[in-house]
């Protein structure tokens, strides 16, 4: 039977109108039919493929966008997205989120120009205004705030924190005089903290997956979430068949049988929040049986053995700790992992060199997250997989030009001397530079002062933050709110002024890769089409706002626009005399051999040629990366990898020391942030995760996970992605709660029953799906649905699990405890 476009749409429309046996499936077909044709279908024209960088997730994948310039009206339209074969992260591949990027560009509910609130906050009443009026309004409010000596009360919250845009925002706050630059990417910062505490390098941790022989993952969904599903998927394929005659073994630790767990060689179910105990139990077996890399431990680490000065008491070392406290029997009782499994996995891990252990959000987002990740990294140190092939390394950065320092005038100096609203850098947050999870408490209490204004850059705390999601009235405590979102999300509804950004297919931006690989990779995002609406690059808006404020604030922004800042920063890369413009693998191999022989042969003579080649190929990278000798690899006080984290000294009454002699004693900390005292507080150790609620009243624990097709607020308005089931018992256009069949039978709940998931913090209504791939004491809810705003495709389906997540946090790492909340399940 021949199906025409008109017939297909008529058929799906009839099904939707009938509303019969198909139920919510009927809605799916109708919505997908409409969404497929929502974008403009271009007439005949001139085709071109333009490189850019995807922004649908943090992966930083290079893409090629097919455009068609109409011969009728001369308008260029983007019609398809594929992977860029030159980009080392994607190599011609792209995930479903990347393909759906067109739907961000063509979203019918995009904000089409500046808006001024004309009714009560949250009422949805807006007046369209021009850009001159909008910027004048923002300038007047900020100038008045500064004139009153309240510059420090300005708060900026950023959700996308790579590249020069967060640098620009932080620079604006510094010049203006506010210490309150806050990021919502707290969970992504924990690997940077682990690198800082163990190696003294404040960069994200990267992983040499392809060269590993054994990969042990703790709560890391490499194939569906994580840092870059495309890059990780390519690495996974290489582990399976990249080297003839060699197949790496992959073991996945998680309470839920995820896509990554199903594709691994072995899934190890575990109780939520106990990953650190398991890692230390594995370490016990490796150490007790002498399976560790004795040369690396002796020559490159500090704190493995007990240590201390001749005149002082002995200090506890990692070896004594794990041998005394983490026997497999004790660890099995904590984690639920059988003793035999603990012993076998430890022996496999130590025997298959190189081996790699890595942790993800499932292991990190608990109140014990930092110590858990330190314990996981200790496994890599035991087998010599730190700064080694097949192991971990610090992410290298591209050699961008360093921006000139900001001249702080008197108003800026006074403002920057004030404490932060989120408490970062002091007390319990002494080790972190941003603590977004603590911001609601500061707003609620008005301490240490009340906020005066709030800038929101790709941040949607009314959805992503448990505290804000339950209490959006907190925004009423802020007199003036500006959102730069291109979409009317949950938080933008409470703004006073909306200055909508371009979508990622309409703007210039740098995208340096982080926490994926290791070599420095700098992607260039460029506009592939003209802006469809009266939107403006947020970087341009910030520069114009700064220049309108005048004085020292304007001096800090000498660039005409954000593209001018990009070009100035990229000068450093062009002049570094290393690396290469992205190219085909065989070209890169030739240039790499030249570099190894001591030659660097550029493909450009001027900066303009360099810039044009970047735009033509998609970016720059350095396959070799800068050389890293031991002095560069370990920049700690001891000059070694530190099992005993001397960088935790700020938590104690006095910091521990390690100079030329790495056996100097440390002070026993009296830390309000951690239950442990004495030497244990400086070592990887297991602390039971703090969870709200009585175990008898709330006997289950909730874990949330990110399916491949959902990225919170970034992709909520893209129906192609909502149509993709997430694996397991999922269906499209639906959110659910997964229940182990044994647990469901005990509670009298059947598959597809309507149920309430309740916690001490709140409750959400969902459909129960029975799923045997789940620990019996655990419920699982996908994260990314349940939006109350964001447009017709984002709203009115699913539920936001953050409404039941408690308000606990890992105060040491400054991250919210989004996993392991105590809950109960009752029939609706």
Located regions from the model:
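C-terminal, active-site-flanking charged/polar segments
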Residues: 477-480, 484-509, 513-521, 546, ...
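Long, contiguous, secondary-structure-rich segments that constitute the structural scaffold
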Residues: 527-531, 538-597, 601-604, 657, ...
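N-terminal leader/propeptide and maturation segments of large enzyme subunits in energy/redox metabolism
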Residues: 117-133, 291-338, 528-642, 753
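N-terminal export/assembly segments and adjacent metallocofactor-ligating motifs
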Residues: 1-292, 313, 329, 338, ...
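Extended redox/cofactor-interaction regions of prokaryotic respiratory oxidoreductases
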Residues: 167-253, 276-280, 333, 377-494, ...
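Conserved short loop/turn motifs at secondary-structure junctions
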Residues: 153-162, 334-337, 360-367, 398-400, ...
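Short beta-alpha connecting loops at secondary-structure transitions
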Residues: 262-268, 502-509, 520-531
